[in-house]
């Protein structure tokens, strides 16, 4: 009943964006999503692979934005096609601020895969949505078949770094003869252990350069510039 009353209230007393004055959609407050995108600035910190707890098998790592409530909301809403235009703007702004290294000029974009159980629970794959948009803007190919998640992994917060690496390594399986250069893609980056485990598998099957691109991270610090 409450959602119905709220929708009826918005219909009778519509709310407007404080900046552009268009009608706010359900879930928006004070400012519309488009105006919020304009306020989110890319980190411009470049390659900060040395800042990851586990990075020995990664050559490159960038995170476009610092993770906060606004970015979290965008990631949550990626499953709705109406939000894709906002993702396009977010990535377009970030791509302008970051240049890929020469080693990645012909790289293949690869979203870090979810286990089928987790993907079923989420009903969509954020990493794949982001990777598809990045591939289009960077004019690169995307191939989701290069890496499969064969093992479901529970939370790893109680595990040591070495235990996390071993646990994640066993979770993935790659195709034979992977491309020389691969860019892994995910929504949010924390320790880097998942990406590093993926990189190990890719290197075992032919990849010589593995990078990582994420939409956001809560761990960016300027000392990793």
Task: Show which residues each predicted segment covers.
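Glycine-rich phosphate/pyrophosphate-handling loop used in enzymes and phosphotransfer proteins
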Residues: 1-186, 190-225
């Amino acid at each position: 009943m409450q959602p119905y009353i709220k929708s009826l209230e918005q219909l009778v007393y519509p709310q407007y964006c404080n900046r552009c004055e268009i009608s706010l959609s359900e879930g928006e407050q004070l400012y519309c999503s488009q105006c919020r995108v304009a306020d989110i600035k890319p980190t411009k910190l470049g390659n900060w692979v040395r800042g990851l707890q586990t990075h020995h098998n990664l050559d490159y790592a960038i995170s476009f934005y610092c993770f906060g409530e606004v970015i979290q909301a965008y990631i949550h809403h990626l499953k709705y096609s109406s939000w894709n235009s906002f993702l396009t703007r977010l990535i377009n702004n970030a791509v302008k601020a970051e240049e890929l290294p020469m080693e990645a000029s012909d790289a293949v974009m690869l979203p870090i895969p979810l286990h089928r159980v987790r993907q079923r629970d989420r009903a969509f794959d954020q990493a794949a949505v982001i990777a598809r948009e990045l591939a289009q803007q960077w004019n690169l190919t995307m191939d989701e078949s290069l890496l499969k998640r064969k093992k479901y992994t529970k939370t790893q917060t109680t595990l040591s770094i070495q235990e996390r690496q071993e646990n994640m390594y066993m979770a993935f399986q790659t195709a034979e003869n992977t491309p020389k250069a691969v860019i892994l893609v995910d929504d949010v980056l924390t320790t880097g252990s998942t990406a590093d485990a993926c990189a190990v598998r890719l290197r075992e099957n032919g990849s010589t350069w593995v990078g990582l691109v994420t939409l956001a991270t809560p761990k960016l610090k300027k000392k990793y510039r």
